[in-house]
């Protein structure tokens, strides 16, 4: 079979990218394959081309409807729409039934399915009537608890592939370290797979890390986006509120509309934002990590992270959305020490008492009917667990992994599934091991991302080493990373003299009018708009300057207080609890 001709005839490409030919040859021959290629390197072709060339059906399991729709529409645009379809809950029942009928009739070559579909009653039985050749698990790192996006729905996929009699299994991911890749192989039961890990070097992307002070961060982001050829851009924020605030501030600073995108927006609004960005009607998106998967925009010139992501894998997947057209692009990561403290806080919060899996298993067993089926109120379980929805989802994953339950797709406020076995000593031991494994993995990811942030050596080489890509780093001259060229870190904009003067006036106002007099820490708390008992008891919230610097970090206010003391515009009394006072020449002014 002439794969190069097929590549040209079906996709219009003249030649394969590194690793693609080997993966396609193995898949066509019916060999298991593990493909690890970053976003934009063409990993989807490694299963699309073999699937289109074979005379049986290739099932592609993908975690997001947007991802599936994007690939189906792209193939349809190449004139292949009659051979490709998807089944999902957003389509009506008659459409899904028609797709399944076409699959049984042998009309389809690629069928896209969400992982939770295999838990739906009767779906696997209907799929048994179809001749399945290749079973593709896209975003395969989701099967590994060591991966950055672990999903319990992926547990059942190895069994589903075997039940369908698939000739070969293809695991595809953009972000898997060697450790995660081995775990993926084990959990999916890959047999002597061809391993392809390549393409992690993105020579057209210049990587940089900056360490701005809190008050410098947002002006620095605006400055980075004002440069020539800086747009379109994606700015990742750590929270929904942060995304909204950034969108507002950047709209004002840049003189063009920046749009917020996060999971708190309704589906229609998210779709509008996504369409406008894809059409270049809006060139700046301020988003949480809910944005990106399934968004195929080739001309993104800049990706900025306003805070440090939880793992190097997550960071590189998001940064890799820049420059997919091969043109010059930049990935800028802004890091503060408070990001590190937040990471530690969240990891510690994820640590789960070892009694909780048993508590949840008891509730499920009590609700199960004679056939083991259960329906529980998710909100009541969250309250009982003393955590949030993430804790509940994590525990359900541990119980699934231990073989106690099999979850079923359901509304967010319901926990639905089937009880498979008792929570006995064996299950308890498996859950303890799983819990320990998960926390160790999170600490490992913490160390890896902060090693990347704090290192002085080449960042591109560190990324390749992390993902097991042995290629020699290549880049455009002067555009590798800030370790190789310090000029790649944008200079913080000069401080706004008016803002500094306003802050100075506010600090001096507090020192002049607060009674009882306050120290530097309480001064910063007053200006930041704090609501502590001490502030309210002494009516500091009634001072003219109260809350006047709420947009600034307390640490930056404290730093300016210290500068005023050093310059002689403020003084502190002695004693164990020093307070601020004005020197005579300032008090008389």
Give a label for each model feature.
Residues 1-10, 14-18, 22-44, 50-54, ...:
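Helicase motor core with emphasis on the C-terminal RecA-like subdomain
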Residues 1-3, 353-451, 456-589:
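Accessory DNA-binding and partner-docking regions appended to nucleic-acid-acting proteins
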